[in-house]
Regions:
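Ligand-binding pocket segment of bilobal, Venus flytrap-like solute-binding proteins
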Residues: 173-180
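Residue-level signal for mature regions of secreted extracellular proteins and peptides
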Residues: 14-15, 30
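Helix-loop "lid/cap" segments that line or gate small-molecule binding pockets
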Residues: 164-171
C-alpha cells in the first residue's frame, strides 16, 4: 500500500513538473480516474476515442489513466485528484464524490431504473483438482473452506463479491438471519 501511495505521489509530482516544460500544446488532456479491472479496457477504448475525436473535431486529445481500488480512487478525487472523468465500480464511491459537489446531484437517475452502468461476474477459483469439491455458494460455508477476497473498503470487486453472495442467500433463504 505504501509503495502504491509513493508511486502515485511520484507520478503526480512528475506530471506537475512536466506540465510546465515545453511550449503551449494544442493537445487536450482528459484524466480518467477508474478502478483496477478496467485498465486494459480503457487502454483500448481511449485509443479509439482519441482517433474518433481527432477525425471528428480535428483536435488531438490525450486520455491519462489513473487506476486503483474503486474506494481509494473515490477518496483521492475527494482529496483533490484532478479528475475530468470518474469510472468507478460502486454507486457509493460516486456518491462520495457527489457530496463534494464534483458530480451533479441525482446522477444515478440518468441510468435506467437508477442502475449501475457496469456489471460484474464472480468466479470461484479452487485448487488444482478441486480437492474440497467446491461447486456452488453453499460449498463456501463448509468447515475447512476459506474464502479469499479483497477488502470491500477499497475494492469495488470485493463489494460485488459480498453482494453476489447475499443475492444467492436471498434466493435460498427467506430468513434474514440465515442469509447472513
Amino acid at each position: 500500500m505504501r509503495k502504491r501511495k509513493k508511486s502515485v505521489l511520484l507520478f503526480l509530482v512528475l506530471v506537475l513538473i512536466l506540465s510546465g516544460c515545453g511550449t503551449k500544446s494544442d493537445v487536450i488532456t482528459i484524466t480518467n480516474v477508474s478502478y483496477d479491472p478496467t485498465r486494459e479496457f480503457y487502454e483500448s477504448y481511449n485509443t479509439m476515442f482519441e482517433e474518433y475525436y481527432k477525425k471528428t473535431y480535428n483536435k488531438e486529445v490525450q486520455v491519462i489513466q489513473s487506476h486503483g481500488g474503486s474506494g481509494s480512487q473515490a477518496r483521492s478525487v475527494v482529496e483533490g485528484c484532478n479528475a475530468d472523468v470518474v469510472t468507478l465500480a460502486l454507486e457509493h464511491d460516486i456518491s462520495l464524490i457527489e457530496k463534494t459537489g464534483l458530480v451533479d446531484a441525482g446522477w444515478i437517475k440518468e441510468f435506467p431504473k437508477s442502475s449501475a452502468p457496469y456489471t460484474s461476474t464472480i468466479v470461484l477459483l479452487v485448487r488444482k483438482g478441486n480437492p474440497k469439491q467446491i461447486h456452488d455458494w453453499d460449498d463456501l460455508t463448509r468447515k475447512g473452506v476459506d474464502v479469499i477476497t479483497p477488502d470491500p473498503k477499497s475494492s469495488g470487486g470485493a463489494c460485488w463479491n459480498f453482494l453476489a453472495a447475499l443475492g444467492y442467500a436471498k434466493t435460498k433463504w427467506s430468513d434474514e438471519n440465515k442469509q447472513k
